[in-house]
């Protein structure tokens, strides 16, 4: 499977059986810069803390950098 990986947001080959993920959360700059984003791959969908959103998928390049709606 190919997944996008941060910080470069490049498509890389991950190990067989892995899933791609998109993890987003707010930090001190959330209101002006938007949510922080972490893209990668893992053996299983990562468990996250409260306040962190995670989306996992299992097709090539299914985790592109999320687009931000501009006001």
Curated annotation (Swiss-Prot):
Keywords: Acetylcholine receptor inhibiting toxin, Disulfide bond, Ion channel impairing toxin, Neurotoxin, Postsynaptic neurotoxin, Secreted, Toxin. Expressed by the venom gland. GO terms for cellular component: extracellular region. InterPro entries: Snake_3FTx, Snake_toxin-like_sf, Snake_toxin_con_site, Toxin_cobra-type. It comes from the Eukaryota. It holds the Pfam family Toxin_cobra-type. Transmembrane segments: none annotated. It is found in: Secreted. Disulfide bonds join 3-20, 14-41, 26-30, 45-56, 57-62. One of its GO terms (molecular function) is toxin activity. The keyword Secreted applies. Belongs to the three-finger toxin family. Long-chain subfamily. Type II alpha-neurotoxin sub-subfamily. Binds with high affinity to muscular (alpha-1-beta-1-gamma-delta/CHRNA1-CHRNB1-CHRNG-CHRND) and neuronal (alpha-7/CHRNA7) nicotinic acetylcholine receptor (nAChR) and inhibits acetylcholine from binding to the receptor, thereby impairing neuromuscular and neuronal transmission. Ranges of nAChR inhibition are in nanomolar (competitive binding with alpha-bungarotoxin gives Ki=1.66 nM on muscle nAChR and Ki=4.84 nM on alpha-7). This is Long neurotoxin Tx-NM3-1.
């Amino acid at each position: 499977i190919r997944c996008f990986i941060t910080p470069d947001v490049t498509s890389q080959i991950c190990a067989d059986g892995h899933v791609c993920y998109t993890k987003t959360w707010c930090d001190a700059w959330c209101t002006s810069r938007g949510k922080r984003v972490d893209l990668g791959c893992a053996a299983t969908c990562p468990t996250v803390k409260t306040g962190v959103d995670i989306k996992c998928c299992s097709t090539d390049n299914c985790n592109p950098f999320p687009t931000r709606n501009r006001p």
